[in-house]
Amino acid sequence: MKKTAFILLLFIALTWTTSPLVNGSEKSEEINEKDLRKKSELQGAALGNLKQIYYYNEKAKTENKESHDQFLQHTILFKGFFTNHSWYNDLLVDFDSKDIVDKYKGKKVDLYGAYYGYQCAGGTPNKTACMYGGVTLHDNNRLTEEKKVPINLWLDGKQNTVPLETVKTNKKNVTVQELDLQARRYLQEKYNLYNSDVFDGKVQRGLIVFHTSTEPSVNYDLFGAQGQNSNTLLRIYRDNKTINSENMHIDIYLYTS
């Protein structure tokens, strides 16, 4: 009897260890499937620019930076951020409020985000790139080992396996932007998320949800971006939303109709 119980417990433990799935529901509680915006509703060049942002463009990634400089009270200007860029020298980070700025100005920070130059307002003209959020404190924010974030993905209600290496971070508190940029790059590579219909862009609607065990979930409509260019498409990250990475997972819902 004891031997049987031991074998059963061992089987359960192995199942938990090897399973690629995590707790998730087939329907998101935050946004109803029918409320999701359709790809066809995006304005003008928005679809192509979203593909450029999430798949092709380089990201601003660095650690242990510090700056007291500003352009406006809700910004932090990192002079000399780019060392080998063809066009830009400085990076201007824009936030929702001065309160967010006060948390990071003059402190050692790490940056990870999507930046843009066209319609970047502030800093030295043609030498400054802009970014929304993407900032975390550097000190006491390191995990003992890299966190690989589990992902549940449903395509038209059918669950698909996502490699565990897809989204990862070494931060305890990480911006949602950092995780979202990695997840959407995978979605573009695997599912042609931001391709037009004629270029095999079968996904028409989508939702990504970031779940933690201690905080409210954060979600984005994958085709809910406003405007056509990066200065508006990326504004969803202006709140610099951060979450605890240690006990979290991501749920993604994709629909082809």
Swiss-Prot record:
Its main location: secreted. Binds 1 zinc ion per subunit. The zinc ion is necessary for the toxin interaction with MHC class II. Keywords: Disulfide bond, Enterotoxin, Metal-binding, Secreted, Signal, Superantigen, Toxin, Virulence, Zinc. The keyword Disulfide bond applies. InterPro entries: Enterotoxin (IPR008992), Staph/Strept_toxin_CS (IPR006126), Staph_tox_OB (IPR006173), SuperAg_toxin_C (IPR016091), Superantigen_bac (IPR013307), Toxin_b-grasp_Staph/Strep (IPR006123), Toxin_bac (IPR006177). Its cofactor is Zn(2+). It comes from the Bacteria. GO terms for molecular function: metal ion binding; toxin activity. Residues 1-27 form the signal peptide. The keyword Metal-binding applies. Disulfide bonds join C120-C130. Zn(2+) binds at H211, H249, D251. One of its GO terms (cellular component) is extracellular region. It is found in: Secreted. It holds the Pfam family Stap_Strp_toxin. SUPFAM superfamilies: Bacterial enterotoxins, Superantigen toxins, C-terminal domain. Monomer. Interacts with MHC class II molecules alpha/HLA-DRB1 and beta/HLA-DRA chains. The interaction with MHC-II molecules occurs at both zinc-dependent and zinc-independent sites. Interacts with T-cell receptor beta variable 7-9/TRBV7-9. Belongs to the staphylococcal/streptococcal toxin family. Staphylococcal enterotoxin that activates the host immune system by binding as unprocessed molecules to major histocompatibility (MHC) complex class II and T-cell receptor (TCR) molecules. In turn, waves of cellular activation, cytokine production, and migration into the lung tissue and airways occur via alphabeta T-cells. Also causes the intoxication staphylococcal food poisoning syndrome. The illness is characterized by high fever, hypotension, diarrhea, shock, and in some cases death. This is Enterotoxin type A.
